[in-house]
Swiss-Prot record:
This is Actin-related protein 2/3 complex subunit 2-A. Belongs to the ARPC2 family. InterPro entries: ARPC2, ARPC2/4. The lineage of its organism: Eukaryota, Metazoa, Chordata, Craniata, Vertebrata. It comes from Xenopus laevis. Component of the Arp2/3 complex composed of actr2/arp2, actr3/arp3, arpc1 (arpc1a or arpc1b), arpc2, arpc3, arpc4 and arpc5. GO terms for cellular component: Arp2/3 protein complex; cell projection; cytoplasm; nucleus; site of double-strand break. GO terms for molecular function: actin filament binding; structural constituent of cytoskeleton. It is found in: Cytoplasm, Cytoskeleton; Cell projection; Nucleus. Gene3D superfamilies: 3.30.1460.20.
Amino acid sequence: MILLEVNNRIIEEILTLKFENAAAGNKPEAVEVTFADFDGVLYHVSNPNGDKAKVLISISLKFYKELQEHGTDEVLKKVYGNFLVAPESGYNVSLLYDLESLPSNKDSVIHQAGMLKRNCFASVFEKYFKFQEEGKDGEKRAVIHYRDDETMYVEAKKDRVTVVFSTVFKDDDDVVIGKVFMQEFKEGRRASHTAPQVLFSHREPPLELKDTDAAVGDNIGYITFVLFPRHTNANARDNTINLIHTFRDYLHYHIKCSKAYIHTRMRAKTSDFLKVLNRARPDAEKKEMKTITGKTFAAR
């Protein structure tokens, strides 16, 4: 299986190029790039007020207000410090980099810029991991509508943190492949006792969402992760956040890859069958044609 990159490579490549050119004393060039990421996220990289010596990176998330309720602003201030500036119009978060004053830890700065989307998500998980660590129970469940018709729920207990993703399958085939895919996670837990418990429910929400307005339908699926202290402690939580916040994209990416692989195999088999049929086809019987004098026509 393929793990999707947590960081945004486009941002990292742009900043790396800008920092290297600035360090070499080259004349700065203009940049104006707008691009999308998973979950409807939009990025904009530009020169503020046309100043080529400065690079502004902005991100737009439709669900940012819900993240703010769980301390995203504070987490971003902690991670980005002075690079964090007032957000550009139409965006939620902006980072400003001055090419005339390069940081000493350029590699770390570039990496964190590429992790902007992940760091926006992180506050929700960090908050509930801390609730579990402190033994708090009964805290209000976090509800993040990370896509127009899909939702993430996070809830903390004294001994665990439960994360539930709702997802919509566009085709009936996706449901079948999704079920097979999720079965692999169950098999994986048998092989590794340190893996989190993963549950999948189709049509109906899990018991954790019993009294909520969680969607119900033939094309709705719910993936539940049960995270224990070994997954949420200070040493493991960063990696847990990296993996779990991209899980929905990871699932649908592999569903599409599986369908593409099946279609490729089907086309290859069809081609093989056609070759067999062509070899088995009997040759057409040649009809001998003669003239009135009895001579035979010969093809030239």
